[in-house]
C-alpha cells in the first residue's frame, strides 16, 4: 500500500512513522513543503524540529516538490496540515483518485465551516474523511498504545485508513459520523484552554471535573444541532479526546490556559508554544457556529472572552459560577 502524508509537522511525521513501522508492505512517503527540511530529515532519519531523537523506520521516505504527482500515485493520502491550510491543500488535490483523510481539528476561521464542509465546497469529487481521536504525536511516534477513529460516509476511505494504520500500537475504529468526530475534535481544544486555566489557577480537581463534564455537554449539544449522532460524543473523538487534551501535559491547548493563568498575554502564550494550538484559532468560530444554531456554550464563550481580553481569569471563573441555577442538561 502506497501511503503519502502531506505535512511534516509533529502529527504528520508521527503517523508516517507509525504506518512505516508496523507494516513492511507499506511504502510511506512524508512530504515536506520545504525542500531543505525534507533533505535534512531524509539524511538524518529524524524530524529534529518536531520529534527530535526519534529515528525514522526504514520504510519511511521523505520528499518535497510535486505534491500532486505523489498523490496521483498513492493508495491513500493523509493531509497533516493545520486547519488554516486545509482549503488550499484540498484545492490542489481536487481530482485525486485515492482516498484522502485530514488530521486537523477545528472550524475554518473565515467561514465557520468544518473540514468536510470545506472539502464539499472546493473538491466535492474527493473520497474523503477524517482521522481523529485522543492521540499525542510523541506517543504515536514512540509506538505507545493508542486508539483512533477513521470517520467518513464512504467505506472505501474508512477501510483505507484501517488498512494503513491499524497495527500492534495503533487500534483504528471506523465511524460514518464525520460530523460528530469533527465537532468533538474542534470543541475539545477550546475546552482544554479552560481546564488549563483552571489548573493554572489551582482551582482544584472538583473544578476540573465540572469543566470537563459540562464541557462535554456543550460539545454534545452543538454536535446534535449540526447533525451528529449522540453516541459519538461518548467515544474516542468526543469524551476520549476531551479527557486527553484537557488533562495531558503534552496538550498545547491546555498549555495556553496554564500560561494565561500565569498572567501571560495571549500573544506571549502562543509565541512560547512553538507549535499550533488549534483551540486559540477555532474558539471564536465554535461560539459563532453555536449561536447560529441556537446552542448555549457558556464555557466556550468565557474562553473567547478571555482570549479577546474582555475578561480576566478570575472574572471568567466568577461568570461561570454565578450563572442562574438550572437543571442538568446534556
From Swiss-Prot:
EC number: 1.1.1.94
Catalyzed reactions: sn-glycerol 3-phosphate + NAD(+) = dihydroxyacetone phosphate + NADH + H(+); sn-glycerol 3-phosphate + NADP(+) = dihydroxyacetone phosphate + NADPH + H(+)
Keyword GTP-binding: no
Keyword entries, A-Z: Cytoplasm, Lipid biosynthesis, Lipid metabolism, NAD, NADP, Nucleotide-binding, Oxidoreductase, Phospholipid biosynthesis, Phospholipid metabolism
GO biological process: carbohydrate metabolic process; glycerol-3-phosphate biosynthetic process; glycerol-3-phosphate catabolic process; glycerophospholipid metabolic process; phospholipid biosynthetic process
Disulfide bridge partners, by residue number: none
Subcellular location: Cytoplasm
A Gene Ontology term for the protein's cellular component: cytosol
Positions annotated as active site in the UniProt record: 188
InterPro entries for the chain: 6-PGluconate_DH-like_C_sf, 6PGD_dom2, G3P_DH_NAD-dep, G3P_DH_NAD-dep_C, G3P_DH_NAD-dep_N, NAD(P)-bd_dom_sf
Pathway the protein contributes to: Membrane lipid metabolism; glycerophospholipid metabolism
GO molecular function, a single term: NAD binding
A Pfam match: NAD_Gly3P_dh_N
Residues noted as binding NADPH in the record, renumbered to the chain: 11, 33, 105, 137, 252, 276, 278
Principal location listed in the UniProt entry: cytoplasm
The keyword Magnesium appears for this protein: no
Entries under Gene3D superfamilies matching the protein: N-(1-d-carboxylethyl)-l-norvaline Dehydrogenase, domain 2, NAD(P)-binding Rossmann-like Domain
Binding-site positions, sn-glycerol 3-phosphate: 105, 133, 135, 188, 241, 251-253
Described purpose of this protein according to its UniProt entry: Catalyzes the reduction of the glycolytic intermediate dihydroxyacetone phosphate (DHAP) to sn-glycerol 3-phosphate (G3P), the key precursor for phospholipid synthesis.
Family of this protein: Belongs to the NAD-dependent glycerol-3-phosphate dehydrogenase family.
HAMAP family reported in the protein's UniProt record: NAD_Glyc3P_dehydrog (MF_00394)
Name of the featured protein: Glycerol-3-phosphate dehydrogenase [NAD(P)+]
Amino acid at each position: 500500500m502506497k501511503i503519502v502524508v502531506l505535512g511534516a509537522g509533529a502529527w504528520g511525521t508521527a503517523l508516517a512513522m507509525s504506518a512505516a513501522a508496523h507494516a513492511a508492505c507499506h511504502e510511506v512517503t512524508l512530504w515536506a513543503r520545504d525542500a531543505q527540511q525534507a533533505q535534512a530529515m531524509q539524511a538524518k532519519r529524524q524530524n529534529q524540529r518536531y520529534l527530535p531523537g526519534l529515528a525514522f523506520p526504514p520504510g519511511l521516505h521523505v520528499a518535497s516538490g510535486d505534491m500532486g504527482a505523489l498523490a496521483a500515485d498513492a493508495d491513500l493520502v493523509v493531509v497533516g496540515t493545520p486547519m488554516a491550510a486545509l482549503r488550499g491543500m484540498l484545492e490542489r488535490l481536487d481530482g485525486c483518485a485515492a482516498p484522502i483523510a485530514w488530521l486537523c481539528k477545528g472550524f475554518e476561521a473565515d467561514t465557520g465551516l468544518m473540514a468536510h464542509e470545506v472539502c464539499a465546497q472546493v473538491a466535492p469529487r474527493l473520497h474523503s474523511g477524517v482521522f481523529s481521536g485522543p492521540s499525542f504525536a510523541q506517543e504515536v511516534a514512540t509506538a505507545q498504545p493508542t486508539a483512533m477513529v477513521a470517520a467518513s460516509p464512504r467505506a472505501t476511505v474508512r477501510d483505507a485508513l484501517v488498512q494503513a494504520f491499524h497495527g500492534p500500537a495503533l487500534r483504528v475504529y471506523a465511524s460514518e459520523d464525520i460530523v460528530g468526530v469533527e465537532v468533538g475534535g474542534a470543541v475539545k481544544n477550546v475546552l482544554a484552554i479552560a481546564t488549563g486555566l483552571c489548573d493554572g489557577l489551582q482551582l482544584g480537581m472538583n473544578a476540573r471535573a465540572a469543566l470537563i463534564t459540562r464541557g462535554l455537554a456543550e460539545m454534545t449539544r452543538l454536535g446534535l444541532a449540526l447533525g451528529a449522532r449522540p453516541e459519538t460524543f461518548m467515544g474516542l473523538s468526543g469524551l476520549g479526546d476531551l479527557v486527553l487534551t484537557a488533562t495531558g501535559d503534552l496538550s498545547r491547548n491546555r498549555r495556553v490556559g496554564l500560561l494565561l493563568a500565569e498572567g501571560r498575554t495571549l500573544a506571549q502564550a502562543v509565541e512560547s508554544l512553538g507549535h499550533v494550538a488549534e483551540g486559540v484559532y477555532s474558539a471564536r468560530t465554535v461560539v459563532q457556529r453555536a449561536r447560529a444554531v441556537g446552542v448555549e456554550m457558556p464555557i466556550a464563550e468565557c474562553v473567547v472572552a478571555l482570549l479577546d481580553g474582555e475578561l480576566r481569569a478570575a472574572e471568567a471563573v466568577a461568570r461561570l459560577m454565578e450563572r442562574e441555577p438550572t437543571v442538568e442538561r446534556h
